[in-house]
Every structure is written in structure tokens, then in C-alpha cells.
A protein has these predicted regions:
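Loop-helix junctions at membrane interfaces
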Residues: 1-165
């Protein structure tokens, strides 16, 4: 049991660092699709809570490198919702829906009060950030599902999940 927890913790840290590096060097203005790609992969491999931890760690690192608090709020809900859906259904494609809804709606809406409180930005509506978060979540979640489908077809996903179980 302790060995598997250690493996999950190490993989969580590796996924957080992978997301940070990809988002730092492959940059699209106001978009972080690789965060959502890694969120989907984390939700399937390590589950919702370790996926949340990976997203939180990456978000904190991104904030320390000059991003806003949106680096955290835009990342943490997707792996939780996607991971819970995967835990219940074992369907990789439904993780996509969890990531897009978790980030595109919950992440966007939760950003509004924090941006207002910490940065003084009053966007007039809690739904203001949805059109900015959703495209990044769609693109990133699609990449994550594509990676998982390839891993599944080559039986690597099954071996990784057995190793972490």
C-alpha cells in the first residue's frame, strides 16, 4: 500500500512539473491548454484528488512565475470532476466532459470573486470568464484524451494503472 501511495505521489509531482514546463514554453495568449491535457491524464492515472494536487502544484508554480490566481482556479476543478467521472464510469471520453465543465464553468465562475478581490477587476458578471476558459479546456482535454486513447490501444495505460493500483 505504501509503495503505491509513493508511486502516485511521484507521478503527481511529475505531472505537475510536466504541465508547468509545457505551459511555460508552449504559450498561447490567455490559454493554457497543456494544463488541461495533463489534468485529463492525471484524472485517469492517479484519480481526482491526486489530479487536484497536480493541478494545484502547477498553478502555484505558475503564479510564482508571474501568472494570476487564474492559474489555480482554471486548473483545479477539471481533474476533480473528470477523475470522479472516470472513477464511476471508467470511460476516458467522459473525462473530457468533466474537464471541460469543471474548468469551463466551475473554474471560470470561481475566478470572478478572486479576480475582483485580489486584483480589483470587476468583470460585472461571474460568467465573464467562461468564453476564455472553455476553448482552452476543450483543446487541452482533447489532447489529453488523444494521449490516453493511444496509451490504451498500446496497452500501456492498463499496465500503468495496474502499477498504480
Amino acid at each position: 500500500m505504501q509503495k503505491n501511495v509513493t508511486k502516485k505521489m511521484v507521478l503527481t509531482a511529475m505531472l505537475a512539473c510536466l504541465a508547468f514546463v509545457l505551459n511555460t514554453f508552449v504559450y498561447f495568449p490567455a490559454m493554457a491548454p497543456f494544463q488541461h491535457c495533463v489534468d485529463v491524464i492525471a484524472a485517469v492515472l492517479v484519480g481526482p484528488w491526486y489530479g487536484f494536487a497536480a493541478a494545484l502544484l502547477c498553478g502555484i508554480m505558475r503564479m510564482l512565475s508571474g501568472r494570476t490566481i487564474q492559474a489555480v482556479t482554471g486548473a483545479i476543478y477539471g481533474p476533480i470532476l473528470g477523475g470522479l467521472i472516470y472513477k464511476k464510469t471508467k470511460n476516458i471520453y467522459l473525462v473530457w466532459i468533466g474537464e471541460v465543465i469543471g474548468t469551463g464553468f466551475f473554474g471560470a465562475v470561481s475566478s470572478y470573486p478572486l479576480m475582483k478581490m485580489f486584483y480589483g477587476l470587476d468583470a460585472q458578471s461571474p460568467f465573464y470568464y467562461i468564453p476564455f476558459y472553455t476553448p482552452a479546456a476543450v483543446v487541452g482535454a482533447t489532447m489529453g484524451v488523444a494521449v490516453l486513447v493511444i496509451l490504451k490501444k498500446t496497452s500501456v495505460l492498463e499496465r500503468m494503472q495496474k502499477e498504480l493500483a
